[in-house]
Structures are given as structure tokens and as C-alpha cells.
């Protein structure tokens, strides 16, 4: 035992007094007085921010959404089964944020950006707020670069540009996710980072998406954010914002990103569930009054940034499900008014074996040809016109018995053009192949081919062009223009085949 000399005692006490600091750590604490259905009501939690993260006694995290006179209504990010009445709650002083970074590429994460694919932890140095302010007018640039989907019907008639928001809308089982996945597959080698957000889907459907992307070598540049149907409404509500935050990291580092929200109907339903449980007043279709703001603040984050901010972009493809093709319901009309156009998929067209089942008549891109390569502009104008005239004639020909030869010829060409737009799933086409296909259809080269054989002929034609006339593809890739030389090569190839 160490002996302390009497004269040392005073110096030790003096030393301890000098080191003593009178810091008081204030912790904002409340008490749960009601819990259930993923909602907790807390008493005594003063000085709490809207959207602040709360930590419960058992480690469960919640978000303060309702700040009322006598209590705080919070939604739980979990089952909340171990949160009990009378347990204490601590305000963290933080707003919901997630880690972001390159390490997320090729991974499957949940709505809180935690990995769920069994490939280990993700190390990330930076964090971003889940909800951040959208870029302003000055920081944006108008959409002018094409975002190729690989689908002829979309790239030719409903072109999408980098930084655009294009809604994919239609009934269930009409191929909405297929269009989104084809767009991801088509970004291979283009340096575009893709984020696929699955909201309220079956885990088996998400596993299928992961497998498809993995087999095609597209998972390396994709992040999948998953909030399955059996997860709490809070996580289904948060998932799209998490996806947007992950994409924003890449956008602000000068990269191009593509975000798919599949689908926003489920997010709105999850938000409705939360709002009703928080006893917020219901509005149309029992949705809360701010359901428009729910989607507008998410989709406004998609932008094409100006050169000072690195020229990055975020393109958003939100998906909305309709009932019996009713586009005038609440959520569809809201999202249509927020986005820069919509691709409308019809169950009738799908059942008529025309896939992708796009209703070209009411689908539109409000950016238009500004987001189209010159080569596509050169051939697509004629295609749109021919198809519009064909649709009108087809409706008329059902009533007329005897048609003149010119009308019959136009109907025959229209049927072949419709065949030309059909495309198998997971087989996006390069720009050169699309241009060659449309050129052949619009210039009458398919008129001699039987309607049933059009698709097989076009596959053969594209293979022949790529193997025997590679110069055509080179010209299109280098100049993005259908030059006279390229047109001559096309004519040669078609005359050799026919």
C-alpha cells in the first residue's frame, strides 16, 4: 500500500479541484403514455424538432411527426413490440440521415441504408440528410442530354433526358417494372449510376430483380433500396427519400444517376396509414392534406445541374399503379402534374400481345426532342406521324367495307410499324440498331415482308448490319447523326437482304 505523506494531501486535493469541470449535460427526455400500430405518443418531450430522431429505452428509433400541445406523436422504425407504456424516450437532436458513398454500388440495402444482402458491412465516410432541399432554379440547367432506355417506342416517341422526371403509369401486371429494368440494363457502359427503390413489394419480386441485374452484369453500377410489404409503414414511407439521398451523393460529384421509385402508390398508402394513426384529418380518398407535398418534394430533387456544380444529373422514373386504367384518381393526377411527362401502359394493349404495352396516344414527354440524339430525330418524326395516321385509319376502317388501295397500303404499313415497336423483355437496343430498325419501317422496306415475319426479319437485319456493315454503327456512335454515308450503308444492307 502506498503511503501518502500529510503534506502531499493538500496538493492532491488542490489538483483535483483544478481538474474539476462543472459541465451539465442536458438530455431531453419524455415518457411513452400510449403505443401501438407503429405509433407512440410521448408526454413531456419538450424542445423537439419536427422530423427529429427519438431513441426509446430498448434502442428502437422513432421520428417525431406530430408536435401537439400536450404530447408528441412519433412513428417507430421497427415493430416497436418492446416499447412499453411508461418507458423513457430521449431526443437525439438529429434529423434522419444516412451514410453514402461508392461502397454502396452493387449492394441491397433497407430504408435506413443498412445492408441486407449478407455481403457484410458497408464502410462510408460521408452522410447525407434523408430529406434535403431540391436544387434551385439558378443551379439547374435545362434538360438537353438523352437518357436512352433501349426501347424503340420510348426513345423514338417519348424521349427521356438526363435530369427529367418521367412517370410510368398503368394497371398492375402491364410491364411497368420491365420498362424500368430495361432502362437500367441499357445504362451498361454509359457511366450512369442507377438506384432502384422497391416500396411495398414482395421479397421474391425484389430477389428476381437482383438476379436479373446480376446475370446481365448490371448490379455493379446499381444500388437497390428495399422496403418490403411486411416492413413497417414508416420504412416504406422513408425508402424513396433514402434512394434519392444515395443518388444525390453521385449527382453532386458530377455523375449521372437514374432513380426508379417502384412504386409511389404504395408509399402514399403507407403515409396515409401513418397519418390516420396519428389522427391527422383525412382528405380525398382518406389521404392526408399534404400527400401532394410528399411526392413533390421527392421528385423535385431530380435535376440537371449547371456546369459550376459539376454538370451531374438525377433522372427520376416514378411508377404509379392505377385501378382499371383510371388516370383521374388522386395519386395518379398528383404525380402526373409533378412530372415532366408520362408513359401510359394499357392492359388492353398488353393483352393484345403488344409489348411494351405503351399507349402512344396519351403518353407524352414534355421535354420532347431536346433530349433526342440527332440520328433519332431524323427518323422518329416520320414514325410518329405514320402511327398517328394509322391509329385514325384503323378506327375508321372497322366501319368502312371497301377501302381504296392507298388506304389499304397505309394500313398494311401501320401494322408492320406496330410490329417493329414490339420488343422482348430484358433486350434493350443500342441507338444504331434503333435508327436502322425505324429507317427500314418508315421507308417502306418492310412492306414486302409478311406481318408475322417482321420481328424475325428485323433481328436478322440487325445481326447482318452489325457483322457485315460495322461502319454504320461506328458512324452513329461517333457523330450521333444519320449521315449520307450511313444512309447509303443502310440502303445497301436492306437491298442485299430483301
Curated annotation (Swiss-Prot):
Highest taxon of the source?
A: Eukaryota
Judged by the first EC level, this protein's enzyme class is translocase
Task: Say yes or no: keyword Nucleotide-binding present.
Answer: yes
Write the Enzyme Commission number(s) for this entry: 7.1.2.2
Q: What does this protein do?
A: Produces ATP from ADP in the presence of a proton gradient across the membrane. The alpha chain is a regulatory subunit.
Topology class, membrane: Peripheral membrane protein
Q: What is this protein called?
A: ATP synthase subunit alpha, chloroplastic
| Similarity comment | Belongs to the ATPase alpha/beta chains family.
Q: Can you tell me which residues bind ATP?
A: 170-177
Amino acid at each position: 500500500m502506498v503511503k501518502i505523506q500529510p503534506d502531499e494531501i493538500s496538493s492532491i486535493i488542490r489538483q483535483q479541484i483544478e481538474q474539476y469541470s462543472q459541465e451539465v449535460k442536458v438530455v431531453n427526455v419524455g415518457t411513452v403514455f400510449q403505443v401501438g400500430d407503429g405509433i407512440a405518443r410521448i408526454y413531456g418531450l419538450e424542445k423537439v424538432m419536427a422530423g427529429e430522431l427519438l431513441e426509446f429505452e430498448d434502442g428502437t428509433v422513432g421520428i417525431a411527426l406530430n408536435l401537439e400541445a400536450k404530447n408528441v406523436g412519433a412513428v417507430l422504425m421497427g415493430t416497436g413490440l418492446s416499447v412499453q407504456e411508461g418507458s423513457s424516450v430521449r431526443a437525439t437532436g438529429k434529423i434522419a440521415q444516412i451514410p453514402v458513398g461508392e461502397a454502396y454500388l452493387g449492394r441491397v440495402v433497407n430504408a435506413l441504408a443498412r445492408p441486407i444482402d449478407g455481403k457484410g458491412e458497408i464502410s462510408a465516410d460521408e452522410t447525407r440528410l434523408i430529406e434535403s432541399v431540391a436544387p434551385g432554379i439558378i443551379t439547374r440547367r435545362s434538360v438537353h442530354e438523352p437518357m436512352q432506355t433501349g426501347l424503340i417506342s420510348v426513345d423514338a416517341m417519348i424521349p427521356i433526358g438526363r435530369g427529367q422526371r418521367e412517370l410510368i403509369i398503368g394497371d398492375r401486371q402491364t410491364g411497368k417494372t420491365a420498362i424500368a429494368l430495361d432502362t437500367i440494363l441499357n445504362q451498361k457502359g454509359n457511366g450512369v449510376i442507377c438506384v432502384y427503390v422497391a416500396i411495398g413489394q414482395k421479397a421474391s419480386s425484389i430477389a428476381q430483380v437482383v438476379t436479373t441485374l446480376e446475370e446481365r452484369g448490371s448490379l455493379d453500377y446499381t444500388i437497390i433500396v428495399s422496403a418490403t410489404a411486411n416492413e413497417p409503414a414508416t420504412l416504406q414511407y422513408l425508402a424513396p427519400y433514402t434512394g434519392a439521398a444515395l443518388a444525390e451523393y453521385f449527382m453532386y460529384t458530377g455523375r449521372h444517376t437514374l432513380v426508379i421509385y417502384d412504386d409511389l402508390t404504395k408509399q402514399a398508402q403507407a403515409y396515409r396509414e401513418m397519418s390516420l394513426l396519428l389522427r391527422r384529418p383525412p382528405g380525398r380518398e382518406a389521404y392526408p392534406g399534404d400527400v401532394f407535398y410528399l411526392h413533390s418534394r421527392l421528385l423535385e430533387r431530380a435535376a440537371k445541374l449547371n456546369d459550376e456544380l459539376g454538370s451531374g444529373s438525377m433522372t427520376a422514373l416514378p411508377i404509379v399503379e392505377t385501378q382499371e386504367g383510371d388516370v383521374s384518381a388522386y395519386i395518379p393526377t398528383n404525380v402526373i402534374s409533378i412530372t415532366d411527362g408520362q408513359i401510359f401502359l394499357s392492359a388492353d394493349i398488353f393483352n393484345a400481345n403488344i409489348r411494351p404495352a405503351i399507349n402512344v396516344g396519351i403518353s407524352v414527354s414534355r421535354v420532347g426532342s431536346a433530349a433526342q440524339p440527332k440520328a433519332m430525330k431524323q427518323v422518329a418524326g416520320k414514325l410518329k406521324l405514320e402511327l398517328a395516321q394509322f391509329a385514325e385509319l384503323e378506327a375508321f376502317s372497322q366501319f368502312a367495307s371497301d377501302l381504296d388501295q392507298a388506304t389499304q397500303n397505309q394500313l398494311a404499313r401501320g401494322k408492320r410499324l406496330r410490329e417493329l415497336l414490339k420488343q422482348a423483355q430484358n433486350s434493350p437496343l443500342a441507338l444504331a440498331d434503333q435508327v436502322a430498325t425505324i429507317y427500314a419501317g418508315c421507308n417502306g422496306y418492310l412492306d414486302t415482308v409478311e406481318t408475322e415475319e417482321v420481328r424475325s426479319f428485323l433481328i436478322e437485319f440487325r445481326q447482318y448490319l452489325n457483322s457485315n456493315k460495322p461502319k454504320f454503327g461506328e458512324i452513329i456512335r461517333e457523330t450521333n447523326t444519320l449521315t449520307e454515308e450511313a444512309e447509303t450503308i443502310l440502303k445497301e444492307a436492306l437491298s442485299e437482304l430483301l
